[in-house]
């Protein structure tokens, strides 16, 4: 994971692909908030406090096809009120709406897969 330090906070560039024609979001992740879930990944790859887990993919593949990137952050920015909820709850809702069991996440040079 490519990580940089900014004003005492660890940040990394991240992209999440859900698909379904959502507008693109990408940018830095504040690892002091989101990264703690990634860093606390257990031996069976399950994460605490969320209902899906991340599976690390060693292959350096690009996110493509019809997938659209969403910014990985605690709350999504934007004028739409339904977007102002915890990020992972939003991801889970959208994945359910799109009938998708997984989405791809790119953090730095690493690609992860989110599975419900």
Question: Model-derived features: where do they sit?
Answer:
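Short, extreme N-terminal segment that most often corresponds to the first beta-strand
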Residues: 1-28
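Short secondary-structure capping micro-motifs at structural edges
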Residues: 1-4, 56-58, 90-91
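Hydrophobic beta-strand segments of well-ordered beta-sheets in folded domains
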Residues: 12-14, 68-70, 103
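A compositionally biased, intrinsically disordered/low-complexity signal enriched
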Residues: 12-16, 34, 38, 90
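A structural detector for beta-sheet-dominated domains
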Residues: 15-19, 55, 73, 106-108
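Short, flexible N-terminal segments of the mature chain
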Residues: 23-50
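Short, intrinsically disordered low-complexity segments
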Residues: 42-81
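Short, compact, well-ordered microdomains
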Residues: 72-115
């Amino acid at each position: 994971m490519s990580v940089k330090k900014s004003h005492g906070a660890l940040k990394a560039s991240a992209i999440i692909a859900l698909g379904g024609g959502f507008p693109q979001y990408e940018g830095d992740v504040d690892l002091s908030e989101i990264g703690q879930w990634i860093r606390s990944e257990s031996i069976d790859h399950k994460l605490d406090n969320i209902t899906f887990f991340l599976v690390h993919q060693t292959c350096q593949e690009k996110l493509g096809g019809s997938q659209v990137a969403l910014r990985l952050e605690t709350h999504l920015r934007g004028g739409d009120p339904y977007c102002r909820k915890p990020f992972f709850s939003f991801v889970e809702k959208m994945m359910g709406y799109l009938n998708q069991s997984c989405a791809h996440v790119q953090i730095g040079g690493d690609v992860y897969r989110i599975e419900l």
